[in-house]
């Protein structure tokens, strides 16, 4: 799976070197990215991070658009220095001129949100469900108390959880 992406990174660098008639230092490529971002270019570390889940689910477009997008950031940084805008003229020049791609800033991949467990707390008031995050539930277990704003009684864990 990663070989294709690494190969595409190399191809993008070869295209940039042919276009600009100079060499570029190759980055470290990592697949340690989660969440909504498809890729991130760390300019000062010369590092590219890619989201393996989004790559797996959108491989064709990822290789065609996302990889050149991130490589263009590193190439722009090596050519023009740190004083440029992330998606500014220099980056757009590379996207259009070198890779012949539209300089799109964001991907349109469907991103699955992770499910979240809520811990249900209650007070004596009718219809008083208070869904707590795991972090807040942990604070209660360590001794923190939360009060109902209406009756001023402490909220008590009901033993119920809900997945959202």
Swiss-Prot record:
Binding, Zn(2+): 69, 73
**What is its subcellular localisation?**
Cytoplasm
Q: Boundaries of each SprT-like domain copy? A: 17-155
GO cellular component, as recorded: cytoplasm
Please provide the Gene Ontology terms (biological process) for this protein.
Answer: response to stress
- Entry annotation: catalytic residues: 70
Q: Which cofactors go with this protein? A: Zn(2+)
Q: What is its main location?
A: cytoplasm
Q: How is the cofactor bound?
A: Binds 1 zinc ion.
- Which PANTHER family does this chain map to? PROTEIN SPRT
Q: Which family does it belong to?
A: Belongs to the SprT family.
The protein's name:
Protein SprT
User: Whose protein is this, by species?
Assistant: Pseudomonas syringae pv. tomato (strain ATCC BAA-871 / DC3000)
Its taxonomic path starts at:
Bacteria, Pseudomonadati, Pseudomonadota, Gammaproteobacteria, Pseudomonadales
Gene of origin?
sprT
């Amino acid at each position: 799976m990663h070989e294709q992406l690494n190969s595409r990174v190399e191809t993008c660098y070869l295209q940039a070197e042919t276009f600009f008639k100079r060499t570029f230092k190759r980055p470290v490529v990592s697949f340690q990215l989660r969440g909504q971002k498809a890729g991130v270019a760390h300019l000062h570390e010369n590092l590219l991070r890619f989201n393996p889940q989004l790559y797996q689910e959108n491989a064709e477009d990822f290789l065609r658009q996302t990889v050149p997008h991130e490589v263009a950031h590193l190439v722009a940084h090596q050519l023009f220095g740190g004083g440029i805008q992330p998606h500014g003229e220099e980056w757009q020049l590379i996207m259009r001129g070198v890779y012949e791609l539209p300089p799109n800033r964001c991907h349109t991949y469907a991103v699955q949100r992770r499910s979240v467990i809520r811990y249900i707390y209650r007070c004596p008031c009718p219809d008083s469900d208070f869904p707590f995050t795991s972090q807040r539930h942990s604070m209660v277990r360590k001794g923190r108390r939360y009060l109902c704003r209406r009756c001023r009684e402490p909220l008590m864990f009901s033993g119920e959880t809900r997945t959202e």
